[in-house]
Amino acid sequence: PAGILNVHPRLSPEARNTITIENDENSWGIDASLELGHKLALVLDIHHHWVKTGEYIQPTDDRFSRIVDSWRGVRPVIHYSVSREDILIDHDVNTLPNMDELLDQGYKKQKLRAHSDYMWNNAVNDWALSFNDIADIMVESKAKNLASIKLFESTNK
């Protein structure tokens, strides 16, 4: 965050008003991103956060409120993806994956962070969609728009 804060004043006003910062599972998480919220809009990537911490952050979490506030009146965006379906082959589609249990079973975070083709886990979809009243959800998947359409259609049944 310090490097970004250092260069931020040298950016044009147009650049300062369009840059967003996203948490990730390697460089920095939500707490480090929040150090930038007074200058830049923050994008919450809920999958990155889960991979980094094992936590299913909730829309009522104070950190998410601070992320929303960083958008200064504009509807925020969150990023949503789920671990690949060919990694969690036997996982129940109606159960949230438990990071501690997966690690105990020998799964590696590097594999769990890879994006799936589609949003195959109903429980994870329900969790992600709990943010929909507050933020736009950008689906990150291998099937791109097809995955977004299928997710949207699943909410209208």
Model-inferred region functions:
Residues 26-28, 47-53:
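Short acidic, Gly/Ser-rich segments with clustered Asp/Glu that frequently serve as metal-coordination loops
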Residues 1-41:
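Active-site acidic/histidine proton-transfer and metal-coordination neighborhood
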Residues 41-47:
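Conserved mid-sequence domains
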Residues 19, 45, 137:
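Conserved, mostly hydrophobic/aromatic
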